[in-house]
Amino acid sequence: MSSLPNASQLDKSGRRIVVDPVTRIEGHMRCEVNVDANNIITNAVSTGTMWRGLEVILKGRDPRDAWAFVERICGVCTGTTRWTSVRAVEDALGIQIPYNAHLIRNLMDKQLQVQDHIVPFYHLLRLDWVNPVNALKADPKATSALPAALAAHAKSSPGYFRHVQTRLKKFVESGATACSPNGYWDNPAYQAPARPDLMAVAHYLEALDVQKDIVEIHTIFGGKNPHPNYMVGGVACAINLDDVGAAGGRSTCTSLNFVLERIHEAREFTRNVYLPDVLAVAGIYKDWLYGGGLPGHNLLSYGTFTKVPGDKSSDLLPAGAIVGGNWDEVLPVDVRVPEEIQEFVSHSWYRYADETKGLHPWDGVTEPKFELGPNTKGTRTNIKELDEAHKYSWIKARAWRGHAMEVGPLARYIIAYRSGREYVKEQVDRSLAAFNQSTGLNLGLKQFLPSTLGRTLARALECELAVDSMLDDWQALVGNIKAGDRATANVEKWDPSTWPKEAKGVGINEAPRGALGHWIRLKDGKIENYQAIVPTTWNGTPRDHLGNIGAYEAALLNTRMERPDEPVEILRTLHSFDPCLACSTHVMSPDGQELTRVKVR
């Protein structure tokens, strides 16, 4: 496995390609690469183009309200940000939540994982691999044999695919679709035959309904989506075993049965459509093993899907770190230790007193400093090319013990596999065996997993794990309620008079995109300081003062592009991370002037 290059070693002499904005993501992102005479990427620059100021807004506010602000960081992985904020306050105040609340939070969290893995694959990254225009050439009868061979799925008749093809033809011919004017549909990077393309379009449409239905679990337990309700001390939904006082709402029994139906529907789709589709893409593009970068070297997970409340050793996906490419050693992670988690700003549009030193989030500073390097091409309001030797992003550089890390499903799965989690090992071994059998290859874990395709497979496998374990949580919740426990919140420390004068806490979770942490300091009942490090700030990190490069930039290196002006290869790899730039950055004006003033009561 090749060594991880330092920024000082990257070749910037070739042609510069700018992708701005990177589309089919959440938020605003810019990417610049240099390509050599053979169209190989030799340098990559990933930029967050908006400033996030919610940490500043939270200062001086009631910590019980923090979740209502920070969940607005993002409308996609909506519940996980709120949950992590609530956990930080509970940690600071020493609050233990009831078992029912633990199970309900787990169900809501895993539901988000399921939906937020299905949507990126089918609706954000699938068009990097699938040519919908080519699907018009497919024979519906021949296509119907494909899903039958892959898995048992009800919607696989010739008539079904003929109907989808007719809809697609009208859509393309209408001229109102990006399929015709904005796609790179004649790019030789697209290698799939017409039949898999038609099957993919059909499943694209099915996934729209699946993701819409599964998210209704949030509305049952959290009242709405996006931005479902939680509360410090538990969850905001009461257990009501009859209709008395339900104000026209469902009883708990009716609601729980509804939740179970959604779980089974998502499970069927994941096993019979999603996983086979991912393996089908991998089989067609079996030689496209670009997009590795940090997974072969540095990986981080905070751990998630805790079975026993308060016991991180019971995580289905454990916490841990891998550094230096040593997959044989999973290191422990402690997010409270100042030397472990640090933020740097030497290449970010922020100001520190000493920009050669990193700050732990409990001591974090969010002070903007928008300035461009001397080799920037263009103006402050119309940048043509960035000068990455200086400040170039609104994302801070994050490091674990001095290492840039990749986070997300692939990191979680490699760490879980190397930690001996049997469910994960069976999934990975089964999938790799199926890939090798269908392609005639004999790739090992370290050859396949650290790649764009491996990252995409890990997301699908985690979706399967999440939806399977939701059944366990549902059964445990029903059993606990039947045993007479109806508690969903611990309000013993709701009154600020019960709080210490000063306290600090941290809430951690694994969002769909990776490690998520919120660090909070309290003083006199108010928030003194608040810092959030979200997954895209790990993966989208700019370079630090030592030249360490982040996951996005590292993953793009050494990729060969068919046509640099049609950057489908860049999109494939970036979309495999499912970037969420709104989580990592928010808003900026060209010259720092006030854009608007909002009074928040």
Swiss-Prot record:
InterPro entries: Ni-dep_hyd_lsu, Ni-dep_hyd_lsu_Ni_BS, NiFe-Hase_large, NiFe/NiFeSe_hydrgnase_LSU. It holds the Pfam family NiFeSe_Hases. GO terms for molecular function: ferredoxin hydrogenase activity; hydrogenase (acceptor) activity; nickel cation binding. Its cofactor is Ni(2+). Ni(2+) binds at residues 74, 77, 580, 583. It is found in: Cell membrane. It catalyses: H2 + A = AH2. Keywords: Cell membrane, Membrane, Metal-binding, Nickel, Oxidoreductase. Binds 1 nickel ion per subunit. Its EC number is 1.12.99.6. SUPFAM superfamilies: HydB/Nqo4-like. It is an enzyme of class 1 (oxidoreductase). Heterodimer of a large and a small subunit. Belongs to the [NiFe]/[NiFeSe] hydrogenase large subunit family. This is Uptake hydrogenase large subunit. The gene is hupL.
